[in-house]
């Protein structure tokens, strides 16, 4: 089973993606994780990508395509892809790769949240720069305000988590996703999921769909 999962900033798509990985034994491919790894390692490519994110801009397709296709070559099947593709050019790159390797996508899940909810969720996020632990000032606060529970380091807010940047990211995302959504609707694999509510509530909107797909595959 191969899955695409989308959602604007703060939609919780990565949290749901990891639940999907645990339940169905898929490989998790996250464009965000691949990008953050490059940034954390301070590579020239990472520094270039950080500059785009700090301005609230999307990273160029050529860079993202290279990261994703490189990962796909090592995985090939039974994966969930988080946050990719986001532009028509990325769709073309992905579709060309999948066609050349005889791979199909079973479902494209779009988790929707409003702009207001996106800002509330994302702007409250805090990151430990030392160990990578993630907190939220409202939903998952550290025991000592501003300090990591794991290593005690001072927590920081990522540049792209500031409210004004979140709003810009959200609007860019929604605009760019219009043709992507239309493409997967034509493929008859697009499913829109209400992302409002807690993690378990959203999960129970997703799980029955994937159980059905998995059971359908088992019967073929």
UniProtKB/Swiss-Prot annotation:
Function description: Catalyzes the reversible transfer of the terminal phosphate group between ATP and AMP. Plays an important role in cellular energy homeostasis and in adenine nucleotide metabolism.
Pathway(s): Purine metabolism; AMP biosynthesis via salvage pathway; AMP from ADP: step 1/1
EC number: 2.7.4.3
Enzyme class name: transferase
Chief location: cytoplasm
Species: Pyrococcus furiosus (strain ATCC 43587 / DSM 3638 / JCM 8422 / Vc1)
Reaction(s) catalysed by this chain's protein: AMP + ATP = 2 ADP
Entry-linked SUPFAM superfamilies: P-loop containing nucleoside triphosphate hydrolases
This protein's GO CC annotations: cytoplasm
Family stated for the protein in its record: Belongs to the adenylate kinase family.
Keywords: ATP-binding, Cytoplasm, Kinase, Metal-binding, Nucleotide biosynthesis, Nucleotide-binding, Transferase, Zinc
Protein name as catalogued: Adenylate kinase
Binding, AMP: 31, 36, 57-59, 83-86, 90, 158, 169
């Amino acid at each position: 089973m191969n899955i695409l999962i989308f959602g604007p900033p703060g939609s919780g798509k990565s949290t749901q993606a990891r639940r999907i990985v645990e339940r169905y034994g898929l490989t998790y491919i996250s464009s965000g994780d691949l990008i953050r790894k490059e940034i954390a390692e301070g590579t020239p490519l990472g520094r270039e990508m950080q500059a785009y994110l700090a301005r609230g801009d999307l990273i160029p397709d050529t860079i993202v395509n290279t990261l994703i296709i490189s990962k796909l070559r090592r995985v090939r099947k039974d994966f969930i892809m988080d946050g990719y593709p986001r532009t028509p050019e990325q769709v073309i790159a992905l579709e060309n790769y999948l066609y050349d390797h005889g791979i199909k996508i079973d479902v494209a899940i779009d988790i929707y949240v409003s702009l207001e909810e996106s800002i509330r969720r994302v702007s409250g996020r805090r990151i430990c720069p030392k160990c990578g632990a993630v907190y939220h000032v409202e939903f998952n606060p550290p025991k000592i305000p501003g300090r990591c529970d794991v290593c005690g380091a001072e927590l920081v807010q990522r540049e792209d988590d500031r409210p004004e940047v979140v709003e810009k990211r959200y609007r860019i995302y929604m605009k760019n996703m219009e043709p992507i959504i239309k493409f997967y609707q034509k493929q008859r694999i697009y499913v829109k999921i209400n992302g409002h509510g807690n993690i378990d509530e959203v999960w129970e909107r997703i799980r029955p769909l994937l159980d059905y797909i998995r059971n359908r595959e088992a019967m073929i």
